[in-house]
Every structure is written in C-alpha cells, then in structure tokens.
Amino acid sequence: MHIPIPMVQISEAEYRVLRAIQSRGATAIESELSVEGLSDREIASAISWLEVKGLLDVERREIKTYALSSEGKRYLREGLPELVLYRKLKERGEMTMDEIRDLMPDTYRIALAQLAKFGITPKEGKLIYRNSGIEAAIEERQRFLQSMDPKNTAMIDHFRHRSGVIDEKIRTERIVRLNDSAYEAIAEFGGEGLIGSLDPSIIASGEWKTKNFRKYDLNSPSSVIRSSLKHPMTYLIEEIREIFLNMGFTEMGGHYIESTLWDMDSLFIPQDHPARDMQDTFYVEADSFDIDHPEISKKIRKIHEKGFDGYSGWGYRWSDAEARKLVLRTHTTVSTARYLYENNEPPQAIFSVEKVFRHESVDWKHLAEFYQIEGAVYSKDVSVSTLKWILRDFYAKLGFNDIKLIPSYYPYTEPSLDVVVRVNGKEVELGGSGLFRPEVLKILGLKAPVMAWGMGLERLAMMYYGLTDVRDLYNTDFEFLSSFRFNISRNGRNNYGKA
C-alpha cells in the first residue's frame, strides 16, 4: 500500500537504487539488482521505503525451489530403494521376502511399494524379475536426484508425493517498476553527499560545519508501534487448557523422546506396523538409556505374542531390541498410557496439549512438528454412549454444535470414531476417538474402560483464524499476529458449528 507523503524526500541510497532501476529499463528483479557501495540488505531496505513513499510499483511472486532432504541425500549416495532392489533382483532372478528384508531392513517397504507401481508384486512369498523398461524408468529418477532439474516437473511431482525425499522452499521475489513520481524524484534530487545521521566522528572533526544534512519531514507517517501480544497458538492452547480444566480434567506431561516400548508396544501396535517405518517416524540414536517401568515389557511380550483370555495377540516373535529403539514421540497417547499405568485407580480424567513429531514433507497441510490435543477418561462408567456424550460436550465448548461421529479404525482403540464438524456448510474431519482395546487395558493393568480422543491443534487454528496454509501459523506476519483476536471476535467461535 502506498502512503501519500507530501514533498517526498529520498535518501542518497534510495536515489541510487532508483537510478539503478532506471538503467535497467525502469523494471528490475530485486535479486538481480546491484548498486555499488550498497549491500543486498541496504538495497532491500531502500526498495521497501521507496514503495512506502509511492515511488515504486512492486509485484511479488512466490518462487518454489526444491532441495534434497537428508533422506534424499542418502538415496543419492546409496541409490533409491527401488533401484537397489531391482538391480539385486535382476542379478538373482527372484528373491524371497526374507531375503529382501535382510538386504534392506530400513527401506524394503518403500522399495516394494515403488516396484509394485511397475507391476512387480510378490507372488507366493517371492519377487520375480521382469524386464520391460523398468530399470530405465527408475534410473531416470536416480539421475534427477543428481541434477535436481527444476524444469523436470514430472520428477518434482513424483518426489513431492514421496515423504521425506525432497524439501520444498518458498521465497518471495519482488519485481520493481518506476512510476511517474519516481522520475520526478530522480529529477529533483540534489542530495548527493548529504549526511543522513550525525555521529561523534562528524562532530569531532568539524565536518558538520561545511556539510549539508538530509531533510526530515516531521509530518510524515511513522511506523505503527505494535504492542506485545501472545502468539495465536499460545492463546489457543490456553483456551483449550481452560476448557479441560473447567471440565475437571488434570493436565499431564510427557517426553519428546520415547522408547518404542512405550510409544507403540504399550498400545498394542505390532512391531511390523507401517507406522514404525523410518519414512513416517523420527528415530533417535543413543548409546545407552534407561526405559522407565521396564517390568512392563514381560507383559507386553506375552500379549503381543500369545494374547490372553480369548484374545489371540499378533502371533509373532516380539523383539526386545526393537522395543528399545528411541523415537520422537508420534502421538501424545503414550503420555496417557504412562499416566494411567502409574495412576491405575479409577476414576481419572486427564488431558494434554503438547507437540508430536512425524516424518512428513512440509506443505500447505502437513508439518513435521505440531501440537496434539489429547483427552482421556478412565472410569467404570465409560462406554460408547458416554464417549459420544463427552465428545458432543467438548466440541460444543470449542464452538462446534453440529458434529457427526463416524466409525473408523485406530490401532489401539475399538470401537473407534472419527469426529466430523460442519464449517461453512462443509463437513470436515476434526479428530479421532475410541475406547482402548482390551489388550491395551491388560498391558497397562487397568481395572476399568478408558475412552480417549484427540485432534491436531493446527487444523483447529486454521479454522479459527481463516487460514488455508498451515505454515502461515508460524510465519512472522505481523498483520496476522496483531489482528488474530479480532478474527476470533468477528467470526465468533460459537458460530462454527452452524451451517
């Protein structure tokens, strides 16, 4: 926006930037603009001030760039999983699933999934080599990792949909154009050699006696002073906490780093579950560590391998080494499990609003680090009916008076329900819920049923603040940061549940 300033005064740096743009035919791209004696930062500052003064027309364009992630760099060095497997398959003719797992224990699932897209799928426990131009197609992917050619949109699109291989970065590029006022300012400028600021050296040398100083218009609009406000996410977290506390819940804490024993095994998630793949979970290297409550591992082993009282378990050989791996927690339900294990006398009503981590490619709707809202009730009165009641009550307090509960699937709850809300006439999934499976209750030594529900805080924030890109929640956009209270007040949370 241009701010009308009478009798515009420009600095020498601004004048030189105008002349540099003029020498390029009155239009220039900021990143390509160079002015002798001025740094890139000084040029950027001058452009911003010239725009404010109405002397430049500025067009902003978003430029997307792509770079290899740490996983992508690994594939560049070692070869894509599908290429490694295909070449080994070509060498041997056929391979069993055990041979494939031994060859590439961390990436065999990725390799199998990618080869399946070329029609190579396991038959009777074996993968059989087939030659139909597949190797050339895979090698083209490998060559792209070397070149990262931005013009190869097909490869960019392919790898954007593969989690964790390439990172997308967005930068804003400014294209600046002189307008009529700019030419007038250039013609009228007579300030070369003007002193813009007085410092001790100028006073000590006496230079100030013979030099001219830059004029300042004391009536010019000044920058808006922005008072300190809570970040919108902090504000929303406090709102959620207040809702839970007013409902009589107790807040629980947790750890960013968890053992898979607690993060997954305690919740009856099998050790070969896809969620454990390195493409979905951040694993942490550690020389030594102590697992809290190690005694639970015996019970976990028994229930995973053989089940109990008519429940069959998973029927595989449970691995203590796998259980001792460390991860950045993938959900906050691990905190619920530990809290109830340590406080196993019902009733208990607990909650948390804390960060979790997923190995996701960051885009408009995904983050690798985000907040999860978790609520749970442990009581002899827990049932599907009480779960439905408390969900309707909780979501109504968030402002969603019209919700639907749809049968779903989660590894550690049965039955499971997705929560669907209505926003501006559209139905949007906003959370999951369910009753802990009997196997989970047995592992944790619980005496009564447990109902739990959760949702992503960022998705809720996007609805409240009218955003379409989750990354905007963490950008330093001062207009958004200073007006988010107004957005809540204007939209009214109580209206979100209405069509």
From Swiss-Prot:
EC number from the UniProt entry: 6.1.1.20
Predominant place of localization: cytoplasm
Location relative to the cell: Cytoplasm
Keywords, alphabetical: Aminoacyl-tRNA synthetase, ATP-binding, Cytoplasm, Ligase, Magnesium, Metal-binding, Nucleotide-binding, Protein biosynthesis
Binding site for L-phenylalanine: T333, Q372, I373, E374, Y412, F436
BP terms from Gene Ontology: phenylalanyl-tRNA aminoacylation
Annotated GO CC locations: cytoplasm
GO MF terms held by the record: ATP binding; magnesium ion binding; phenylalanine-tRNA ligase activity; tRNA binding
Record note on quaternary structure: Tetramer of two alpha and two beta subunits.
PANTHER family: PHENYLALANINE--TRNA LIGASE ALPHA SUBUNIT, PHENYLALANYL-TRNA SYNTHETASE
Family affiliation: Belongs to the class-II aminoacyl-tRNA synthetase family. Phe-tRNA synthetase alpha subunit type 2 subfamily.
Name listed for the protein in its UniProt record: Phenylalanine--tRNA ligase alpha subunit
Upper taxonomic lineage: Archaea, Methanobacteriati, Thermoplasmatota, Thermoplasmata, Thermoplasmatales
Gene name of the encoded protein: pheS
